Amino acid sequence: MEQAMLKTLALLVLGMHYWCATGFPVYDYDPSSLQEALSASVAKVNSQSLSPYLFRATRSSLKRVNVLDEDTLVMNLEFSVQETTCLRDSGDPSTCAFQRGYSVPTAACRSTVQMSKGQVKDVWAHCRWASSSESNSSEEMMFGDMARSHRRRNDYLLGFLSDESRSEQFRDRSLEIMRRGQPPAHRRFLNLHRRARVNSGFE
């Protein structure tokens, strides 16, 4: 019994060594990469928001990482944003103070970020109001390609979509990015689907 276990362990170690020797993609999910993805997501929100003030992330979590090859990956994030005291032309919202009050605009957001060699290549995001006092449950802010600008509405909303339509668009966008960067068929087994939850280290 012990010999069988030792043999299994030895085969496992040899298999891991073989994968590493053949270039199995290993990506270092350091805090700077996650911060870069979050910053790009918040920047997308601010770039297409109709608010006169900048939004800033209050909390975030990494929901999924799709590794396409040794240099390219797609991150799916969830994060919350709140309006700050800085005007739109203030630049980086990371140093801005949050506005105070019961009716301060706050939204829950999701984003898909494609990164290559540590650099952000593409970002898609959408948000919904976190407070029912701000809008009803069907109202959302959509942040994506400028081709969607016809969906803009009053206040800070950029679209009205049902939950089903929102889910389909988010899923289609993530799949589109993965297909665009899909490696050749003989290397598809290298794709990883990892789930990780990150504490509010971006706060």
Curated annotation (Swiss-Prot):
GO BP terms: bone remodeling; protein-containing complex assembly
Major site of localization recorded for this protein: secreted
Post-translational modification: Phosphorylation sites are present in the extracellular medium.
Subcellular location: Secreted
UniProt keyword terms in alphabetical order: Disulfide bond, Phosphoprotein, Secreted, Signal
Family annotation (InterPro entries): Cystatin_sf, Spp-24
Residues modified as Phosphoserine: 90, 137-138, 162, 165, 174
Signal sequence, renumbered to the chain: 1-23
Record has Disulfide bond as a keyword: yes
Cystines in this chain: 86-96, 109-127
GO cellular component entries: extracellular region; protein-containing complex
Sequence similarity: Belongs to the SPP2 family.
Function, in words: Could coordinate an aspect of bone turnover.
Protein name (record): Secreted phosphoprotein 24
Organism (species): Mus musculus (Mouse)
